[in-house]
């Protein structure tokens, strides 16, 4: 579940600047499972707790709009406010618990654009890279064909 607000401010010659804010909530259910161990007749029991994530994004985009399409460059600051994950393990004798703290802050840089093929169809694509957080996205590519009806 997410909510995003941005406002495109037009500049001269088709250029624009676009400040943005976004809030993203997600939930992953917990799960229990059992697996085999190296010990004869022993099973490993694992209980993965549920996880709630709440991320905010504050960004600004710069771009150029033409008759044939749009290109942009966007920089965003992300912060995870929750995202803690707890897991319990047991081989029947020695229980162990671990917790990962999900709170983190990172920066994302995105470059992309849209090219109009006709009034109803366009190609789009963008490249994204993140910096500074515990989990990094070396490069992510999103691309597609958009058809409006």
Model feature map: region roles:
Residues 1-149:
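Membrane translocator/pore-forming domains, dominated by Gram-negative outer-membrane beta-barrels
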């Amino acid at each position: 579940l997410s909510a995003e607000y941005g406002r495109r401010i037009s500049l001269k010659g088709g250029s624009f600047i676009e400040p943005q804010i976004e809030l993203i909530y997600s939930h992953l259910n917990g799960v229990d499972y059992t697996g085999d161990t190296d010990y004869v007749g022993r099973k490993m029991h694992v209980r993965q707790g549920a996880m709630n994530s709440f991320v905010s994004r504050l960004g600004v985009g710069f771009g150029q709009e033409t008759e044939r399409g749009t290109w942009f460059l966007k920089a965003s600051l992300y912060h995870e406010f929750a995202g803690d994950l707890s897991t319990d393990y047991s081989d029947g004798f020695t229980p162990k618990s671990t917790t990962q703290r999900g709170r983190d802050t990172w920066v994302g840089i995105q470059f992309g654009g849209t090219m109009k093929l006709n009034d109803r169809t366009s190609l789009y694509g963008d490249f994204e890279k993140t910096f500074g957080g515990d989990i990094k996205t070396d490069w992510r590519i999103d691309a597609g064909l958009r058809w409006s009806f």
